[in-house]
C-alpha cells in the first residue's frame, strides 16, 4: 500500500480461517522490533523468520484477529543496496531532520497509512482496530497512538526510553526514538499519555537496559495521571516484571492477549 507518493510499504496480511467479508473480525497492526537486524521486518511477527518469541502476528491471527505486519523504513524490503544496516537508518534520520521532520514523524505516517489500508478490507471490523509492538515496535505504537484515533486499543512491550534516562545513562538509542525539540516541552511518557482515554497496556522488564527502570517508574505515573485526568484510569495498565529483561515473556504475552480480548473483542 502507498504511504506517500512513490513510497509503498510491503506488508503481510494474516486473515484467520473463518473470517471473511460476511464474518469480519477485529484487526491488529503489529510493529516489528529493531534489534539491529535490518534484514528482518514483517517476516518476524508473521512467523516466517527470526525469533519464535516474536512470532506475535501469527499468534494473534490464531486467536482470531486479522493482522497486518508491515516493514518499517530501513528494514527488510525497505532497504537499499547502496547503504546497509545502520548506515541507511542514519542517512534517513538525517535526511528527515534537515527537512524539519524526523523518523518518528515518518513512522507515525506509515502506521496511519496501515490503518487506512485496513479500512479497505471488508474482513475487518472497522471500529475494532488495535496496535501491538515490541521494542522499536512499542515505540512506534505509543508514538502513533495519539495521532491515530482509529486505534481502539494499544499494547507496547519493553520500550519506553525517556530522554531523561538516555541522558543520565549516556544511552545510545536507535533513531526512531528521537523527536527534535520535544524535550523542552516534555518527555516520552507525556506523548504516550495523549492516547487517553483509549486503552493502553505497557509491559516492562525490570532489567531492560533499553528502558532504564528508574525513569520508567516515573513515566508510568505520568501516563496514569493523564488517564485519570481523562476520567479513564481503568483504560491504562502496566506491569514491570521482576528479573526480566528485554523480552516478551509468557506472562507479558498473556497480559497482551488478555488486553486485546477485553478491549477489542469484548
Description of each model-found segment:
Residues 23-24, 29-112, 119-120, 165-169:
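Cap/lid segment of the alpha/beta-hydrolase catalytic domain
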Residues 206-215, 245-247:
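Acidic catalytic loop of the alpha/beta-hydrolase fold
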Residues 122-135:
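Alpha/beta-hydrolase fold nucleophile elbow
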